[in-house]
Amino acid sequence: MPTYRDSKGQWQRKQPVTHQEFMADHSSRQRFWSRNMVGWRFMVEAQPNNAHQALVQLEELGVISCLVTQNVDGLHQRAGSRNVIDLHGRVDTLSCMACGMQYPRAPLQIWLEDHNPEYALLAGGIAPDGDADIDHLDYSSMEIPDCQHCGGIIKPNAVFCGDTL
């Protein structure tokens, strides 16, 4: 998975949507969910790498007992790490920002594709955290999910820029 910043901390691509933009602006959520719908394919197909496997081996040997990560992709758990603290959350679960209802991300993909078939056909370059590089689109027709319980805003359980831990 690509990262947002280079080794010197400089942005490598356009800055992602902030928590404040996501919460305040419907069009920001439309942009987010259209890009996330396209980029989700990359998240589902991502596999743990040698570094993930090495950390599992260190855990099995008792060298480490807990892993704290800023990664939001769940690859440490998929590799077999058992005691993982996802400091920045996970993108494979969602929460309603009004009532706290929890949702798995995978079924939402089907909903997004069913309600937005014109976006489902798009191809985009891989970007961090389930995002895709598909700028210069009109997102105004993108149907986005609301909480099935209260109608509130649904957001991935990951820290966005400007969000709090």
Language-model segment annotations:
Residues 1-165:
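Conserved catalytic core of sirtuin-type NAD+-dependent deacylases
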